[in-house]
Amino acid sequence: MHSCSDTFHGFPAFVDMLGGEFQTHGAQAKVECLNQDLSHPAVRHFGESFTVYDEIYLLKSFHRNRVHGLLTLDKHPNTKMPGDYPISWNKKVGSGSVFYTSLGHRNDVWENEKYQAHVLGGIRWALGLVKGDFKPQDTRYRVSQEEEKDGFKPLFNGVNLDGWKLRNPNGLKSWSAQNGMLVNEIPSGKHGTDIVSNSKFRDFIVRYEYMIPAGSNSGFYLRGRHEIQILDDYKNGKLKSGGNGGIYSFSAPSKFVSRKPGQWQTAEATIRGDLVTVMLNGVKIHDNLKVDRSTGGHLDENVDQPGPVMLQGDHGAIAFRKIRIKTLQ
């Protein structure tokens, strides 16, 4: 159970066998644990997620490619900054089986029937009484068959930063691939760095999802010159060119459709010539808007030339996923 990850520090064989090691924890918090295997006997009763108030361990010496994930968080339990924070997993070690969960620090958690089913399901799997997958999941991003037929290709592969480079090669290496997410983490008092795709595009459709924490700020640059603003402005609720979904310093979105910080938002942008259309969370907020100049923070002023996708990383924490692109003739 949870405390076993806080034992035998300094014994690599034990840590390797378990799959992770306790590092620290913050205050008890309400978290939404995301279910990574809807068919596994330890977690299938949870459905898509399990919300619990508990003390959440932060782990080290953990490798996604060595375990089969069962429950995880996509943000820090206390700060809510984006990132991969594993909660439960299973694996095979030789002819033996390992099931681990970091939940269970409170009496009310132990009394929760869903938690009891979680523990019992994991034990039954480890004893070989029920079947369940134990192979590490593949976090590489692949577009759907429908999108592939339509010409879309992944721009971020979900597993590493291949195909991307820092705008400033000497800047802080704040970007990393975490469990299918492209995450920008900036330590307190530090300054992050923009990240730029190696490939350049002129006319295209790009689709992506992003999650921004409270108070943060980022941007998605078309051709490295036209910024679709990303901002936590949910409480503000006002239409501004500098607001979420705005073409920065150029045009406010036509509708306010921002989601709460910490929630995933979906976007689609089409640029053909100097005309830009943007969909945010399924709603069209810019419709064939003529954007004939760079909008600030851009790579250059060559607005009619192909350019890369650039993600703003110098303003705050952000996570992207499922970035895919289709070039237009």
What does each model-found stretch correspond to?
Residues 1, 68-71, 98-102, 183, ...:
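Structural recognition of the beta-strand scaffold that forms the well-ordered cores
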Residues 73, 93, 105, 210-212, ...:
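Short beta-strand segments enriched in hydrophobic/aromatic residues
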Residues 8-11, 35-39, 63, 82, ...:
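A structural signal for well-ordered alpha-helical scaffolds and beta->alpha junctions
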Residues 76-85, 92-142:
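Extracellular ligand-binding/catalytic regions of CAZymes and related secreted enzymes
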Residues 20-94:
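Catalytic beta-strand/loop cores that center a nucleophilic Ser/Cys/Thr
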Residues 1, 94, 179:
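Single, functionally critical "micro-switch" positions that shape active/binding sites
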Residues 4-35, 43-52, 123, 130, ...:
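Carbohydrate-interacting regions of secretory-pathway proteins
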